[in-house]
């Protein structure tokens, strides 16, 4: 599928998820929630810094790249334990999408939603 079609479909799906089962709602309540304001950074480096500020205690140097994002999502950097289920609420998503561009935004979303990367992250997108 072409990128131009993939991102809008993914965003639409995230904004209009299927109703959660009772069990899924209970599991979501038990997650540590992080809120990312998409209007709080102006470039990719700012995005990575903001993620590190939100999800680490600042005692470990993290990289400004997609691999570091994946590591931070896994946990173990002072805020959530390694492998602990988390939820990321991404506010002002369209601002971030414009700032980061569609190719990087799609790669970030793919990492966040990829359950095979040893992290358990629910994503909610708000505009």
Regions found by a protein language model. Give the residues of each.
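N-terminal intrinsically disordered, low-complexity segments enriched in P/E/S/T
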Residues: 1-60, 76-127
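A short, aromatic/hydrophobic, helix- or strand-capping loop or linear motif
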Residues: 61-66
């Amino acid at each position: 599928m072409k990128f131009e079609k993939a991102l809008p479909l993914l965003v639409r799906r995230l904004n209009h998820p299927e109703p959660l089962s009772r069990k899924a709602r209970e599991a979501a309540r038990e997650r540590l929630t992080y809120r990312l304001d998409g209007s709080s950074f102006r470039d990719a480096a700012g995005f990575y810094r903001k993620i590190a500020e939100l999800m680490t205690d600042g005692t470990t140097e993290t990289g400004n790249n997609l691999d570091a994002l994946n590591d931070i999502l896994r946990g173990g950097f002072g805020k959530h334990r390694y492998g602990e289920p988390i939820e990321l609420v991404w506010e002002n998503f369209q601002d971030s999408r414009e700032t980061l561009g569609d190719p990087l935004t799609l790669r970030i979303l793919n990492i966040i939603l990829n359950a095979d990367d040893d992290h358990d992250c629910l994503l909610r997108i708000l505009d």
